[in-house]
């Protein structure tokens, strides 16, 4: 495992997934994580009772206290044990606590960080512009490595075939040459042209010019200017469950139109469902770093740049 990856922020859930007095279980980098809330406060902990290692996800919540199902140990919202039923009169040591994680709440999503030393949060420019509506979608579970999922997101040549009559049409599959710039901060591809009959659920067809960004190993985005003052952005977040399984969330940002949140989510659900069986079928499961293992062509420029970016950062997770 690359320590560098653990320093990044990962989407653990949408806020709507967390219900009062219920424990939500997730998996991140093969670690079991629980999420629960009391009113507006969200707690994200390791799924492990400090006493005898039982899963706290089997426990219960009442009045802002999480109770372990095994011996009834009770933990407050600061992850500190406040009651040991078998010895109610003892002074509870400070080490009787659950490991908790840093949390960022933004755009109706919850991010966590598994490291004490964190990288900067990926802050998309449109996040801070008040005229943009935002809709979070997911989770989408994909039995594929995180790099495979990201590379598919960056690939436009599959649009006419996997997303026919939505993101592309089979009689217009050509991808013109486009520009790619790589740096230590990521990748930027511009002037990516593709004909699309219904690219964002608005049923407006025509040639679309995209720009793509890789912000960190497992965060990428695409954007397009619909008109001079109208812009569409889709951010793609991959949270690794394991080296060969991923949890995906997307964030749609638009400063035009008045689409219902459900319509946006339904469209994203539909598009992602088309991608899943394709990406899950790819072999090898781990993304090859040796570019000679597969045959690449000009339209693969951004995926080649992505593989070189991972290699330059010495990423070994999800790759071969």
Question: Which residues does each PLM region occupy?
Answer:
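Short beta-strand or tight-loop elements
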Residues: 8-10, 31, 99, 174-176, ...
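Rieske [2Fe-2S] iron-sulfur-binding domain
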Residues: 4, 11-129, 134
């Amino acid at each position: 495992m690359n320590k560098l990856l653990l320093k990044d922020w990962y989407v653990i859930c949408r806020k709507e997934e967390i219900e009062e007095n219920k424990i939500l279980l997730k998996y991140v980098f093969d670690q079991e994580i629980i999420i629960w809330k009391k009113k507006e406060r969200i707690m994200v902990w390791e799924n492990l009772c400090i006493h005898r290692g039982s899963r706290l996800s089997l426990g219960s919540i009442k009045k802002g206290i999480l109770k372990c199902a095994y011996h009834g140990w009770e933990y407050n919202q600061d992850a500190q044990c406040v009651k040991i039923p078998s010895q109610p009169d003892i002074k509870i040591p400070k080490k009787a606590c659950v490991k908790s994680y840093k949390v960022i709440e933004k755009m109706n999503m919850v991010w966590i960080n598994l490291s004490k030393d964190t990288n900067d949060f990926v802050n998309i420019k449109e996040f801070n512009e008040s005229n943009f509506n935002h809709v979070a979608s997911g989770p989408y579970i994909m039995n594929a490595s995180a790099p495979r999922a990201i590379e598919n997101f960056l690939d436009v040549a599959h649009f006419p075939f996997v997303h026919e009559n939505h993101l592309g049409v089979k009689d217009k599959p050509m991808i013109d040459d486009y520009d790619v710039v790589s740096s230590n901060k990521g990748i930027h591809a511009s002037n990516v042209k593709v004909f699309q009959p219904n690219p964002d659920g608005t049923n407006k067809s025509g040639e679309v010019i995209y720009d793509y960004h890789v912000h960190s190993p497992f965060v990428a985005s695409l954007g397009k200017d619909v008109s001079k003052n109208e812009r569409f952005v889709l951010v793609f977040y991959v949270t690794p469950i394991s080296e060969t399984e991923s949890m995906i969330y997307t964030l749609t940002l638009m400063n035009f139109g008045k689409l219902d949140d459900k319509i946006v989510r339904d469209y994203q659900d539909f598009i992602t469902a088309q991608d899943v069986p394709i990406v899950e079928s790819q072999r090898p499961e781990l993304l090859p770093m040796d570019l000679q293992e597969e045959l690449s062509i000009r339209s693969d420029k951004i995926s080649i740049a992505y593989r070189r970016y991972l290699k330059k950062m010495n990423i070994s997770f999800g790759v071969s």
